[in-house]
């Protein structure tokens, strides 16, 4: 966005903050605690567990290619990554802190004041710049070089089995016996149509 261009300093700072447990009340929970890198920056569990061992109502969404999403959270309640990053800090089930306390901890830190100065030319760290840095990092979480991406660009070939899977994925809903009809909702190249669907599951 126009008010938060990506910079090398901002992305690097955002990555540090994403893995920083100081953002939680007791210093045990970071963004990465639920958005796990090994699982596409998502939580493989049905419900994510927060700072006090409490379970949330949903699990942490995948962040890969999140830069292309205009509505965030499972209910679309956030309009951009900056807006979304405000929420977990003060959520009593997630990180259960206050922005005043988090800002004070970061301002008193041995490294963060200089890093925020380099990224945003500010002398006092506050919530607005914390979420801007995290959002910058999240916009760099891009998967664009998988085998499917390379095939889509005409750079490699898929195996016969993979091509059969692609055909099944793209069979139209009028003939369920012939395939899976995935593509209507999981639309290439991001494998989402960026809308919300009721699939009948709680």
Regions found by a protein language model. Name each.
Residues 1-87, 149-202:
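Short glycine/threonine-rich turn/loop motifs
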Residues 42, 91, 109, 144-145:
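Short alpha-helix boundary/capping motifs
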Residues 51-139:
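Periplasmic c-type cytochrome electron-transfer domains
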Residues 112-173:
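Amphipathic alpha-helical substructures
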